[in-house]
Structure formats: C-alpha cells, structure tokens
Amino acid sequence: MSFIDSMIAAVSPKKAYEREAWRQGLEAMRGYDAAGFGRINSGWRAHNESAEITDRYSRDVVRARARDLERNSDILQAVVLAYKRNVVGKGFTLRARTGDDDLNRQIEKLWRQWCKARNCDVTGEQSFTEILRMAVERKKVDGGILFLFRHTSGGVVPFKLQAIEVDELDVTQSAPHRQGNRVVGGIEYNSWRRPVGYWIQQYDLEGWRLLQPIYIDAKDAYFLKSKRRPSQIREMSDMSHTITRIRDVNEFINAVSVKERIAACLAVLIKKTIPTGTSLGRSGIRGPDGRVDYSGKKLGPGMIMEMGAGDEAQVVDPKGAATDATAFLKVQQGLIGAGQGLSYEAVSRDMSGSTYSSARQNAIEDEDTYAEDVELLTEFMSEVYEQFIISCYLSGVITFPGFWDKKAEYMAHDWVKSPKKWIDPAKESTADKTALQSGQKTYQEICAERGKDWRQAIDETAEVLEYGREKGIEMGGVIFGNGTAAAQQNAGGQPPQG
C-alpha cells in the first residue's frame, strides 16, 4: 500500500478498500504484459482473422516485393541458393521396390530416360531435376507452384509436366464447376475445404490474357506449398517475414557505398590573388585579366603545372572515419538466416569463425530445416512417379501382370538423395565406422546417408573382390583394411588359401 493509500485508509477505510480492490481487479485482468496497451505497446494493434482473410490482401504485394528482391538482392539469392543446394542438390535417384529385380531395373532405366527435358517437360526445356530446383525457388519466393499432369503424345511415355505460376490462378472466377462447391482464389473447394479443381487463366504467346479460364481437376494437378494454419487456402511467400530486413540491409549497403565513393574523391581549389602588373604569355594559359586560367584542368599522375603568382592550391579530401559495416551486416545476415531456419554460415558462406565442431553442429541443424522441404518435394515426386507408372502400363511400355490388383506393390519405391561431401573425411569416416561397429547405425543407414543402395553396394564390392581374384590381386585389404589376406601378404606372411 502506497503512502497516499495509507492516508486515505486513516480517513476513510472504505475508500481505501475500494481503491485496493479495483487495483487488484485491474492486475487480474491484465494477465499478460504482451496484451497490455501501455506506452510501449500503444501502437501495436493486431486482430485475429482466418488465414485466408489475413493473407488475401497482402499476398500479391508480398510476392511482388519478394520477386523484386529475387532479381536485385544478393542476400535473398543467398537464402534461395542455400535451399536449392541442399534440398535438391545434384538430384534424387529412384529405387524401384517391386520385388522383381529385372522389373526394377527396367523401371529405373525408363525413369532415367523420362527425366530428360524432351520427355518430362511439355516445353522440352527443363529436365526433371531442373524442374525440382525451380520448384524450390518458386516456393521460397512465391510461396508455391502448381504442376499440371499432361498426357500428351511424344516422349518415352504419354505423360509430361506443365509448371504453372500461382499468378495464373484466376482469382476473378466465382462460379464453381460442380454445384455445391465454392471457388476461392482460383481454387474450387468442396464442403470439407478439400481442393477439387483449379481455374487457370489463359494467355496467348505474347502474354495477353484471354477471357475464359480453363478448369483442371485436382487429380490432374499438384499444388506444391506449405500449409501453416488449418484455415489457410492459398500459398504465402516463405520470405514474407524476412524481406523487410533484407531490403533494409540493401539500403544500408547502398548508403555505405555512396559514402565510401564520396570519401574516395579528391578535389583541388585554387585560391587566387590579383597580380600587381600585366603578365605576358599565351592567352591559352592566362585569361583577359592576366591571371592563370585553371578551368577544365584535372589532376593526373606525375603532372607538372605552373601556377599564377601568389596562387595557392587547397586540397579538399573528404575522408573521414571509415564505416565498419562488417559487424552490422554479420548480425543482419544471421537474423535473416535464422528467420529462414538456417545458420549464419549457410547464408553468408563465411566460415572464418567456425571450427569443425560448430560447422558440423550447424550443418546438422540446417539439415533438419531442409528436411521439411525435402519431405514436401519427395511427396510431389512420388505423385509424379505413380502417374509415370500408370502411363507406362496404359501405354504398354512395361507389362505389369494384375496391375490394378497389385498397384501398391508395383508403385513401391524409394528416393535416394545425392550425398554431400564430408567436411573432414577422416573424422566422419571414423565416426561411421564406430557407429556401425557399436550397433548405433546399420549398414543400410550408412549406405543411405552416402546416397547408395546397400544391396548395390554389396554387389559392387563382391564384383571387385571376384575380379581381383581372377587377376591374382587380393583386394580385401584395400577395401576392408588391416587383418585381411592382403594385409598379411604385404607383411610377408602367406594369405589363406581359398
């Protein structure tokens, strides 16, 4: 109780009690400091709306600004390229799991042919891996990308992909294709908010929009995007919460560049005096008043120039304390990377302050971030693969006995991502060996991390050993290390006879 309350209590206990009761009630209502509207939060007004209402009026503006930074900001490109390198990298390898080795090899061979640009892309310009890289970039900048499954002639199978930007969804369409559905943002939904179709705007070759959109059934399309709220319907740029900081950094860099250019300038001013008499000489050097004319003259290396009598050259050198932008940029890049779930090293490529342990830990944390996009991408790839298998069966390219009864078995598959190179091969290979021998990892897990199929790895190893024996060379020691027949032979002993 304050001094004033004590004075009031001495005169009127009832009033003091009421003041204290109201004060405690006010404290109970406040609950959270974050919900207060005091001096600090007085201008912070926020409202709870559904995700679509929140995103609808900002989606196009945010996407346009993100694209502008995509074209003009090296910092945003650093974030996007980090995702492209680590989510797609060198691509994915298909491992068919039908249970029939001959059929698996046939499917994998045909898949490699289909992944070429002329077979998988309706435009014939991008291979499947290039399409995946573009999908990652468009998801980060635009928020998503739409793929249409086109069954066209040409190619190894009558199936190709058509990439559609989210701008091409017709937001003006209101009449549904099927009665009872609703169209919101160019996407038609049923009563359960499940997408059942997409309305796509049509353009001619010069980019002029045609009046009538076309309807694409949801089973013939795949919308690659992230969903962060149950009420979210359309996409939202993944860069929405970092583009303001990226733009601030760009403006800061431009301001520092201008300041440093000004600081690098050097000028000379001539302080003139009026001569005491008429001077003789060429008119090209002296003016009508007899003084030396310096107009149009510039400084040059090693120059020698005569000045007028009593004239004085004053140098203007605007150099000041150089702005140390390194610390500021490092903090900002760290915040930008953190906003995208990445470490500072992944975004800036600056490893000067990193040790092996810190670099390895950051790489592990970054892998968990990339795993979310890898999961989304592999779901899309699996959908494409299933369409590919169905097209192979319907076109008769591959024979699948009892296909519709055993469709799940014929479509079983795995994706093997191309491995990344080790930071320290000696340490990481030793760690893998220890994990394998102690049972912390299986041989299958070790091979999967290296982007290999464990059965194929064993087959290749057996092939090397068998070929070495045929040529009279024991390769066991080379492959497996000490304690093998090759190691004993090199030590002067006799290898065991097979």
Where are these regions (language model features)?
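N-terminal-proximal low-complexity accessory segments that begin disordered
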Residues: 1-96, 497
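Short amphipathic alpha-helical segments with coiled-coil-like heptad repeat character
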Residues: 199-204, 344-345, 452-459
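Surface-exposed loop-to-helix/strand elements on domain peripheries
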Residues: 101-104, 108, 304-423
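A broad, structural surface signal
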Residues: 105-116, 120, 134-141, 145, ...
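Structured, mid-chain assembly/scaffold modules that mediate subunit interfaces
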Residues: 70-227
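Extended, charged amphipathic alpha-helical segments
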Residues: 222-359, 403-404, 486-487
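Short, Φ-rich (hydrophobic/aromatic) sequence segments
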Residues: 57, 64-95, 131-140, 239-259, ...
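C-terminal anchoring/interaction modules
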Residues: 2-16, 350, 360-361, 379-498
